[in-house]
């Protein structure tokens, strides 16, 4: 949960790396993240996103551990309004977007994370 909180609050890799393997990988079938391949890149991407949406926050809906597969999943809803600089000019529009993180562990560190997210829906709501 500490990694999730640090990542979702835009703490960047500096705030997330203690919970991850140094070479932790990342994947998502979402256009804004197509070139993001490491968890470090993703944590830094989230840091940038939070600069564009300073009111961004999440609401956890489910958090589950599958000990047999060394996997933790988190389902949440991200809400935010595009009022900050960086990326497209601020639109003042908001999104409320469902997503899931599937985090695979090696011991007590995340070795891989997959994000399941309908980015097209969120981008449309934001006017991007």
Language-model regions, residue ranges each:
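C-terminal and inter-domain tail/linker signature
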Residues: 1-128
